[in-house]
Swiss-Prot record:
Gene: rsmA
Identification of the protein by name: Ribosomal RNA small subunit methyltransferase A
Function: Specifically dimethylates two adjacent adenosines (A1518 and A1519) in the loop of a conserved hairpin near the 3'-end of 16S rRNA in the 30S particle. May play a critical role in biogenesis of 30S subunits.
Compartmental location: Cytoplasm
GO cellular component, one term: cytosol
Keyword Cell inner membrane applies: no
GO molecular function: 16S rRNA (adenine(1518)-N(6)/adenine(1519)-N(6))-dimethyltransferase activity; RNA binding
Gene3D superfamilies documented for this protein: Ribosomal RNA adenine dimethylase-like, domain 2 (1.10.8.100), Vaccinia Virus protein VP39 (3.40.50.150)
NCBIfam families referenced in this protein's UniProt entry, alphabetically: ksgA
Length: 275
């Protein structure tokens, strides 16, 4: 059965508070599966399985699938629809409260697949990256605006702290755009399927990751201000900051959106040296 048929079979009522939009376009489903490159060596963690349409395809291809679902009304539906699969584990919990490192312990090839509710997209991605969770890739359907921020380059309005965070840890690839007509109920915004492939090492080597991300966040907190004004929030004396900018070879009158990840790394290391 397809998604619409399962929804009708169980007379499921969508929960607006959970941002539920179920995928009904089979071509998008196929592109997610192909893009995620799932094989029998992989453990898949799926966030937001809905009624299990994508989950079935994952179960056919993966070694095992762990699906995380918050909505208690979906639990019996998933249990019934996927009862024939012995490689399926259903977790009834808020994904924001999951200990992903514990879940991934002693598993070698882990890939995440998710149709993320828009309100949890950035917190989930940030947690998975900063907590150094052991995953190979993350294939997600997210709001078009967020995907464009993740995939942005310096000197454009989409480029920001989320861009730097994701590209510090991952290569990014947009798989396809998805129209609102591909879902029930129909969302008000376009979506994009994007894949994040985890790098074996962060894109730049820095002396302090904590300082690096503090510099990045401070640089984008007030986008229209210069680096000099933005980085005053670090509470470093004027002479030391002048020294750091000079050593990094970066003009303090530039704005954060003009710096590459490598330049952010160089600047944070020079600040680290003068602390």
């Amino acid at each position: 059965m397809n998604t619409k048929e399962i929804v009708n079979k169980y007379e499921f009522k969508f929960n607006k508070n959970l941002g539920q939009n179920f995928l009904i376009d089979e071509s998008v489903l196929e592109d997610i599966i192909e893009g995620a490159e799932i094989n029998k060596e992989d453990t898949v963690i799926e966030i937001g399985p809905g009624v299990g349409t994508l989950t079935k395809e994952l179960l056919e291809r993966a070694k095992e699938v762990y699906s995380i679902e918050l909505d208690g009304d979906l639990i019996p539906i998933l249990q019934e629809e996927l009862k024939e699969y012995n490689n399926f584990t259903l977790i009834h919990k808020d994904a924001l409260k999951i200990d992903f490192n514990e879940l991934m312990e002693n598993k070698d090839s882990i890939k995440l697949v998710a149709n993320l509710p828009y309100y949890v997209t950035t917190p989930i991605i940030s947690r998975l990256l900063t907590e150094k969770c052991n995953f190979k890739s993350l294939t997600i359907m997210i709001q078009k605006e967020v995907a464009e921020r993740i995939n942005a380059e310096p000197n454009c309005k989409e480029y920001g702290s989320l861009t730097v965070l994701v590209q510090y840890y991952c290569n990014t690839k947009i798989i396809r755009k998805v129209s609102p007509n591909s879902f029930i109920p129909r969302p008000k915004v376009d979506s994009i399927v994007i894949k994040l492939d985890r790098l074996s090492e962060p894109r730049v080597r820095v002396k302090s990751q904590k300082l690096f991300f503090n510099v990045v966040r401070s640089s984008f907190n007030m986008r229209r201000k210069t680096l000099w004004n933005s980085l005053k929030s670090l509470n470093i004396n004027k002479e030391s900051m002048e020294n750091a900018f000079e050593r990094a070879g970066i003009d303090s009158k530039r704005r954060g959106e003009t710096l590459s990840i490598e330049e952010f790394g160089k600047l944070s290391d020079c600040i680290y040296d003068i602390l």
